[in-house]
Amino acid sequence: MMTKHEEIQKGVIFPAGEKNEAYAQVFTGQSYLNMLVNDPEVSVGVGNVTFEPGCRNHWHVHTDGYQILLVTGGEGWYQEEGKPARRLRAGDVVVTHKGIKHWHGATKDSWFEHLAITSGNSEFLEPVTDEVYEGLENQ
């Protein structure tokens, strides 16, 4: 299978960062993380997250805050529980409010990158099953 958007593996606007070992247990596949704001006086996290093709995070909720995703490259998915998945491309913006169960990640044949601006804590839940993920390509 041909992989799309391979140029993203080096980063689009910001460098892709290191392998995301700290969160590897809540991802299916390989992701990379470059935290862009490391100021302890700033109450939001800002990170550049890069996903290899097929990589996605587990279902999760932001328990006491929110998350804004600014898509910078590639093709990916965003899905809230009980709703159809949304295909994401560069320029798309997603706002996830407190308590909404969701996941996001790359399509199976494309690299994907977004900036994640996150306030508060995240609670990671079960993985997105292969059955659910593979079914998205048919939407």
Model-found features: residue ranges?
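A short, N-terminal "cap"/entry segment at the start of jelly-roll beta-barrel domains
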Residues: 1-44, 124-139
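Conserved hydrophobic/aromatic positions in well-ordered beta-strands
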Residues: 34, 47-49, 69, 115
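Ligand-binding loop in jelly-roll beta-barrel domains
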Residues: 40, 77, 85, 89-90, ...
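A structure-centric signal for secondary-structure junctions around beta-strands
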Residues: 43-45, 65, 111-112
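A short beta-strand-loop-beta hairpin characteristic of the jelly-roll/cupin
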Residues: 56, 61-90, 100
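A short, polar/proline- and glycine-enriched secondary-structure boundary/capping micro-motif
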Residues: 69-70, 89-90, 115, 125-127, ...
